Amino acid sequence: MSDSPATAHTRLELPIDIIKIQALLPHRYPFLLVDRILELDQKQKRIVAQKNVSINEPFFQGHFPEHPVMPGVLIIEALAQAGGVMTQLDLSHNGHSSLLFYMVRVDNARFNKQVVPGDILILDMTMKRRIRNMGCYYGEARVNGEVVACADIMCAGVRS
């Protein structure tokens, strides 16, 4: 196991695969939008995740059949899910937290470029603060190093 800054606090081997992600998030197909965790630094409250965008995504059937584009709201949801993985790891005992997090607010959302089939979406989330059961994050989604979307996201945790 590596002792890099990304794993020293969590003692998790990176990358974190879909099996571990499914143990941390309640989302399932077709709404699980995080495929892999590439970086995790719980001391800095930062996570970097990956979403492989495939033409087989069900939303491409209607958005748009002749010009498939990933809906911006799903990019924001993917960012929130990445933040959810980080928060669950931070709060969990034996890999599971008793809180279920819901997105309750999105501010300053910007969409700079379309995300299309074949893109690898890199989701970079930083927790700005946590107040009791609320988490405030800033996230950027990138394709080929270029920011395609960003937003401030607030999530609230409730007992599951």
From Swiss-Prot:
Name one process (GO BP) from the record: lipid A biosynthetic process
Q: Which reaction does it catalyse?
A: a (3R)-hydroxyacyl-[ACP] = a (2E)-enoyl-[ACP] + H2O
UniProt GO molecular function: (3R)-hydroxyacyl-[acyl-carrier-protein] dehydratase activity
For this protein, the record's InterPro entries field holds: FabA_FabZ (IPR013114), FabZ (IPR010084), HotDog_dom_sf (IPR029069)
Subcellular location, record wording? Cytoplasm
Give the GO cellular component terms, alphabetically: cytoplasm; membrane
- Record CDD domains: FabZ
Q: What is its EC number?
A: 4.2.1.59
Which of UniProt's keywords are assigned here? Cytoplasm, Lipid A biosynthesis, Lipid biosynthesis, Lipid metabolism, Lyase
- What domain of life? Bacteria
One Pfam family this sequence matches: FabA
Where does the record place the catalytic residues?
63
- Residue pairs linked by disulfide bridges in the UniProt entry: none
NCBIfam families in the record: fabZ, PRK00006.1
The family classification in the record reads: Belongs to the thioester dehydratase family. FabZ subfamily.
Function, as annotated, reads:
Involved in unsaturated fatty acids biosynthesis. Catalyzes the dehydration of short chain beta-hydroxyacyl-ACPs and long chain saturated and unsaturated beta-hydroxyacyl-ACPs.
Name listed for the protein in its UniProt record: 3-hydroxyacyl-[acyl-carrier-protein] dehydratase FabZ
Q: Which organism is it from?
A: Xylella fastidiosa (strain M12)
**What lineage is on file?**
Bacteria, Pseudomonadati, Pseudomonadota, Gammaproteobacteria, Lysobacterales
Provide the gene name from the record: fabZ
